[in-house]
């Protein structure tokens, strides 16, 4: 997004930081489901959540992406830097599209809601 043409609230929703935070939540939700089915060691998701939530560094992820040339691999590599061994259970059984498409859908909802509230505020009855 071009900042000078964007509402600050929308710039925040579409920022790299927000995108990567949403990716983490998606990965953790799947990891928790895998734990419930006995496919992942119990506590893996909680450990990753504790060690990585609020600590993601978008600049570091982009640095890794410049090397790997793959956005999701760069993200997962950075999460592993933060969380260590339990992060290896993230992305199990998933494709990059599973994360990207779900996150895109999850971004449209708050962005659309913000725009609707804004547009409705412009209507004078």
Question: What are the functions of these language-model segments?
Answer:
Residues 1-123:
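A helix-coil-helix interface module used to build multimeric assemblies
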